[in-house]
UniProtKB/Swiss-Prot annotation:
Stretches in topological domain Cytoplasmic: 1-6
Protein name according to UniProt: Glucoside xylosyltransferase 1
Record flagged with keyword Oxidoreductase: no
Main function: Glycosyltransferase which elongates the O-linked glucose attached to EGF-like repeats in the extracellular domain of Notch proteins by catalyzing the addition of xylose.
Species of provenance: Mus musculus (Mouse)
A single GO BP: O-glycan processing
Ranges in the topological domain labelled Lumenal: 30-404
Cellular localisation: Membrane
Membrane topology field: Single-pass type II membrane protein
Positions annotated as glycosylated: N201
Chief location of this protein within or outside the cell: membrane
Entry EC number(s): 2.4.2.42
Keyword Iron set for record: no
Amino acid sequence: MRRYLRVVGLCLACGFCSLLYAFSQLAVSLEEGAAGGRRPQAAVVSWLADGGRGTGRGAGSAGPGRTGRYDMKTRPDEKMHLAVVACGERLEETVTMLKSALIFSIKPLHVHIFAEDQLHDSFKDRLASWSFLRRFDYSLYPITFPGDSAADWKKLFKPCASQRLFLPLILKEVDSLLYVDTDILFLRPVDDIWSLLKKFNSTQIAAMAPEHEEPRIGWYNRFARHPYYGRTGVNSGVMLMNMTRMRRKYFKNDMTTARLQWGDILMPLLKKYKLNITWGDQDLLNIVFSHNPESLFVFPCQWNYRPDHCIYGSNCREAEEEGVFILHGNRGVYHDDKQPAFRAVYEALRNCSLEDDSVRSLLKPLELELQKTVHTYCGKTYKIFIKQLTKSIRNRYDTPPKER
């Protein structure tokens, strides 16, 4: 009887210990799920270990994953991330774009600059004079493509243009990102387009504007030899991304019945369509989202206003009503006389300093220059170029000053 009681007691003790262990493991798993369940899972790409990561050098940056010396102490979700790719003669254009972003931005802004090696020192010199800006820091990165296929990617459309396709794989610690071309000008705070991330539904991973509003002058619907998104395709010059979702998603495609992740789909797409695409990386993005339309959020044309919206007559209704939010001077219109209205806005911001008085005083001279362009199609509606700009300056600079 005594032996029986000992056995029962031993079993009860073992059972109690097992119960305690089970509860402790459950608590640990719940903690991990809450703290780390949403960490980005990027595709494993071997070339990243050989230079795909940014150097992070330059004034105002302490490298990827570390805060720069001009960075305010903020939670990660408070900081906005902007990326640009600059090659060739794009230094001045890029600096002007960055200036337009900083003039109106409210939240801290971290800029990821991907540039050819010979441009790095020039960027550091130009941006060093902005070190007084408490809400701005940046990182410089080399132009990097996957090893065996680097030559194919470099000659796709324009030099370096396809670098943007690899941003989700290179910037693995960045959750969300706004990519813009160098020929972009912000006429309202970056914060406003950044806020569109909150409008994504559960399936959407990126946002772009339509390539055309009017199908009769559309390029994709008339000439494309590959799939494209929607009625007229999308333009990738302004692209807002939830990169965590992009890295996790398995994409439908027309190459295999299996769904592929971002790091696995790019090269097969290029191999299949490289003889049929005209606009390089933008065409590849159109192909991806043509098969995954539920993943794209489409914002109105005023967020990516181009010469095509006015050279054939005004065809961006939202810009007519509220003004241009983001100006996209593609086709080199900032640097020739074909579209003087676009060039006037670019020159005004290029010559503007980051001092408050300089920003306040740019409107009147700009309006006078725009009035000289009324003989052109885009100049006929010149007021849409300054409608939102006027509001942005008033809201940012005619209110009590805040630390910038």
